[in-house]
């Protein structure tokens, strides 16, 4: 369900304060955050934010097409590694039971 238009987009307060301070000083430094639920707003464009994926911080450069999306959408939390082709234990095989 979409967020009501009466409410402002959610941005964590520490992240918002850091963005405003960097925009006033016109600095371009890496910002580390654990707030994956924060919405990307216009003041974040042009900055690099390191978003935590549960294991490490992934640096993401914010562009204008990302506005309105959540930070967590750009930092995947799981990586699927394919099973080896010749590993029969990890692949499911059909089990036949003869009576």
UniProtKB/Swiss-Prot annotation:
GO terms for cellular component: chloroplast; mitochondrial small ribosomal subunit. GO terms for biological process: ribosomal small subunit assembly; translation. Pfam families: Ribosomal_S19. GO terms for molecular function: rRNA binding; structural constituent of ribosome. Coiled coil: none annotated. Disulfide bonds: none annotated. It is found in: Plastid, Chloroplast. The keyword Ribonucleoprotein applies. InterPro entries: Ribosomal_uS19, Ribosomal_uS19_bac-type, Ribosomal_uS19_CS, Ribosomal_uS19_SF. It comes from the Eukaryota. PROSITE patterns: RIBOSOMAL_S19. Protein S19 forms a complex with S13 that binds strongly to the 16S ribosomal RNA. Belongs to the universal ribosomal protein uS19 family. This is Small ribosomal subunit protein uS19c. It comes from Oenothera argillicola. The gene is rps19.
């Amino acid at each position: 369900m979409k967020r009501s238009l009466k409410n402002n987009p959610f941005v964590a307060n520490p992240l918002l304060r850091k963005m405003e301070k960097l925009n006033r000083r016109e600095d371009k430094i890496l910002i580390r955050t654990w707030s994956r639920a924060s919405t990307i707003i216009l003041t974040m464009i042009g900055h690099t934010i390191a978003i935590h994926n549960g294991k490490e911080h992934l640096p993401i450069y914010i562009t204008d097409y990302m506005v309105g999306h959540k930070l967590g959408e750009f930092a995947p939390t799981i990586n699927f590694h394919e099973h080896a082709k010749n590993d029969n234990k990890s692949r499911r095989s059909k089990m036949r039971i003869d009576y």
